[in-house]
């Protein structure tokens, strides 16, 4: 036989005992504030107190001191009330962050989870309310629906964070302001429609007509609400605009007329191509009051981007011009390219010459240092074009002899002294420079085919093979630059290695090639 109310009666009895100080065997000190409680209740609700009482001796369990810089006294009082009541009553004077810090210190994971959910919901609500404040235009009398109530205050009961669903903020689309006769008084916009019991009929909302002297510009975009901006906002930057009455939504004109700025000397002249002038249309005079039949809002259209046939042609030519920044494969390695492969584009005479920078790298920049071609392998005329090409494309890794002037503390080049661009060391030949480059790149291109160990220099691999795999291998008298760069090191025809291989002796194969691994 079960008694469902037994747990509630037990908690109520414990609350009464704590309030009277009856059988309270523990005092919790949070700063200078004391809290009387029962050890069994504290240890049952918090793993922190459970470990504390297990580790302490019997005569040292009466007083528990908690760091008051982490756990505040009001937050601990709320958690202590939760232990005895099973309900967390969040008050306005205690920040939710303090409750979260206290629950984390006491290892009360359920309270931590609830506090995090509430903080996330509050952050989302504040972000949505800020977005709505930015999008809402106070001058156009935009009213939210009755279901949009914004963030709710913190309550005693715990609610899941899923309450902030998209249906909470879903409302009808913002209606366009409707003009009303002059004798009808406008509805005041000071009423608060966010309360649940107040609803406003949208058919009775009327926006006051704008004054004749102050014409406003309405800028509409698909991702934001309509904002009303005075005409003098564009007085400094944009040219004058033409004014025409707003066309009803159910009336579709036969041909859409593009309204463009009348002044062509504005700041947008260099960005947009000129468009053919549309046929002039009679614009209403601002000094005259509109007729009763045409008692509608006057909307000023600002067309910043004019769509024309010329702009469509320019958009089709744009991919071809972007390809012209880099030369084709035949232009770099083939010396003189053909006229069709050169940088020739119609109407591209307005390109400016780009100075030397790191944005345009040679095609060989992805190769390692030991595979880069030497000074003699570069062509002087990389690109032959009637248009100026970027200067960085003409600069090889090893400049020709005319670049004898000093170029800073590193990379000083002379005619016969190759210099490392990284550390500034000079070498006798370009092969030594490429061999030295592996010190900076940390590359190990030479790999042993027997044990797959990698080495930076070919000589190290040769000595490893001679010592580890074949002790009788002939010593190298002098490194061969041509054999060790790309083709690899091959044993001489009259060496001991070739004779041993031809005789068919036992042991591992003696024919090998030293070179960079693929």
From Swiss-Prot:
Biased composition (Basic and acidic residues): 472-481
Positions of post-translational Phosphoserine modification: 308, 495
Organism from which the protein derives: Mus musculus
GO cellular component terms attached to this protein's record: nucleus
Segments forming domain BTB: 24-92
Taxonomy of the source species: Eukaryota, Metazoa, Chordata, Craniata, Vertebrata
Plastid is among the record's keywords: no
Chain residue ranges for the region called Disordered: 126-207, 310-338, 349-368, 472-518
Domain of life: Eukaryota
Known role: May be involved in transcriptional regulation.
Chief location: nucleus
Start-end of C2H2-type zinc fingers: 418-440, 446-469
Name assigned to this protein: Zinc finger and BTB domain-containing protein 3
């Amino acid at each position: 036989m079960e008694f469902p109310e037994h747990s509630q009666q037990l908690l109520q009895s414990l609350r009464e005992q704590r309030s009277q100080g009856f059988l309270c065997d523990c005092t919790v000190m949070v700063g200078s504030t004391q809290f009387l409680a029962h050890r069994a209740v504290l240890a049952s609700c918090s793993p922190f107190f459970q470990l504390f009482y297990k580790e302490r001796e019997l005569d040292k369990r009466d007083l528990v001191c908690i760091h008051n810089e982490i756990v505040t006294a009001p937050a601990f009082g709320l958690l202590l009330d939760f232990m005895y009541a099973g309900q967390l009553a969040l008050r306005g004077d205690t920040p939710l962050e303090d409750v979260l810090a206290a629950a984390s210190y006491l290892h009360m994971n359920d309270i931590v989870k609830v506090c995090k959910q509430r903080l996330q919901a509050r952050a989302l609500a504040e972000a949505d309310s800020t977005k709505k404040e930015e999008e809402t235009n106070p001058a156009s009398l935009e009213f939210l629906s009755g279901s949009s109530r914004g963030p709710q205050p913190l309550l005693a009961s715990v609610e899941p964070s899923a309450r902030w669903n998209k249906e909470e903020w879903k409302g009808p689309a913002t209606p366009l302001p409707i003009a009303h006769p002059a004798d009808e008084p406008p509805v005041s916009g000071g009423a608060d429609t966010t309360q649940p019991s107040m609803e406003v009929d949208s058919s009775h909302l009327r926006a006051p007509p704008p004054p004749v002297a102050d014409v406003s510009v309405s800028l509409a975009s698909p991702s934001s609400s309509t904002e009303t901006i005075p005409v003098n906002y564009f007085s400094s930057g944009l040219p004058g605009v033409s004014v025409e009455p707003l066309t009803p939504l159910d009336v579709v004109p036969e041909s859409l007329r593009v309204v463009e700025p009348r002044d062509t000397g504005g700041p947008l002249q260099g960005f947009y191509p000129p468009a053919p002038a549309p046929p002039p249309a009679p614009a209403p005079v601002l000094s005259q009051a509109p007729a009763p039949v045409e008692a509608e809002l006057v909307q000023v259209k600002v067309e910043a981007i004019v769509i024309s046939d010329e702009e469509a042609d320019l958009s089709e030519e744009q991919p071809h011009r972007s390809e012209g920044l880099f030369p084709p494969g035949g232009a770099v390695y083939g010396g003189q390219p053909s006229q069709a492969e050169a940088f020739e584009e119609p109407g591209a005479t307005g390109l400016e010459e780009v100075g030397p920078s790191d944005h345009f790298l040679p095609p060989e920049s992805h190769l390692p240092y030991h595979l880069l071609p030497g000074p003699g392998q570069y062509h002087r005329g990389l690109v032959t074009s009637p248009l100026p090409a970027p200067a960085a494309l003409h600069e090889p890794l090893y400049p020709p002899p005319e670049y004898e002037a000093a170029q800073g503390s590193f990379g000083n080049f002379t005619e016969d002294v190759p210099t490392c661009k990284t550390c500034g060391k000079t070498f006798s030949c370009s092969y030594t420079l490429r061999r030295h480059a592996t010190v900076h790149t940390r590359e190990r291109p030479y790999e042993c085919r027997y044990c797959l160990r990698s080495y930076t220099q070919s000589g190290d691999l040769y000595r490893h093979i001679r010592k580890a795999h074949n002790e009788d291998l002939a010593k190298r008298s002098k490194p061969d630059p041509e054999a060790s760069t790309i083709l690899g090191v091959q044993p001489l025809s009259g060496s001991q290695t070739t004779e041993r291989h031809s005789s068919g002796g036992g042991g591992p194969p003696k024919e090998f090639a030293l070179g960079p691994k693929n």
